[in-house]
């Protein structure tokens, strides 16, 4: 079963204003997370929260029960940043944008004296974002536009294969929460369609979500 990506309609106003890309729904391959049948959520601590999830899935998938939900109506929706993967010290798509500014700087010598790019090239993210949504929009437009969707997907894919989180030094695509991957797999195994709601760009997510 596939994951679907939906543009966020709530929170993250700055990023949404700058990075929400066109399209309502984009199918991606399932996230990894196969689990032993003896324990569908092995990374979860034993306790009430884990048991509630298991009880809920059992209740809605047990035909004839009072809480039974037909497979075609089983839908689960998840946030992405901070839920399925980490979001600190800032959204990962913005790390991508920062790296793109550095990669494109040689083609734009004027950026050395133009904000928000001048501050970014000096490593001062706080100063670069002092311009608010307008600054964010300039950064996104400069780093996400002017190419086909296939070209953008290739650039994002190459970045995801090499870029590292500044603290953990792990690839950004490895900064996922295993317990949540287990929930996704558990739900799919019981007939749920899973959806991701994100303030990030669909095309950005499409390039790595199948990993």
Segments predicted by a language model, with ranges:
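N-terminal secretory signal peptides and thylakoid transit peptides that target proteins
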Residues: 2-23
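C-terminal motif of bacterial Sec signal peptides marking the signal peptidase cleavage site
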Residues: 26-27
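Alpha-helical substrate-recognition element adjacent to the catalytic core
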Residues: 35-211
């Amino acid at each position: 079963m596939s994951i679907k990506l939906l543009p966020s309609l709530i929170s993250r106003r700055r990023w949404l204003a700058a990075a929400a890309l066109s399209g309502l729904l984009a199918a991606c391959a399932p996230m990894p997370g196969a689990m032993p049948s003896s324990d569908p959520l092995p990374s979860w601590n034993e306790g009430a929260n884990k048991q509630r999830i298991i009880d809920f899935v059992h209740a809605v998938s047990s035909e004839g029960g009072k809480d039974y939900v037909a497979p075609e109506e089983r839908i689960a929706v998840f946030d992405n940043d901070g839920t399925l993967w980490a979001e600190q010290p800032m959204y990962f798509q913005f790390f991508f944008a920062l790296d793109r500014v550095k990669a494109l700087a040689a083609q734009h010598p004027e950026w050395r004296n133009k904000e928000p790019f001048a501050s970014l090239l000096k490593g001062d993210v706080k100063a670069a974002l002092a311009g608010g949504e307008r600054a964010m929009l300039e950064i996104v437009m400069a780093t996400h536009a002017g190419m086909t969707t296939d070209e953008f997907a290739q650039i994002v894919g190459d970045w995801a294969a090499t870029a590292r989180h500044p603290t953990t030094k792990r690839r950004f695509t490895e900064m996922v929460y295993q317990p949540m991957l287990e929930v996704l797999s558990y739900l799919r195994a019981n007939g749920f369609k899973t959806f991701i709601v994100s303030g990030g760009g669909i095309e950005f997510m499409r390039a790595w979500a199948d990993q």
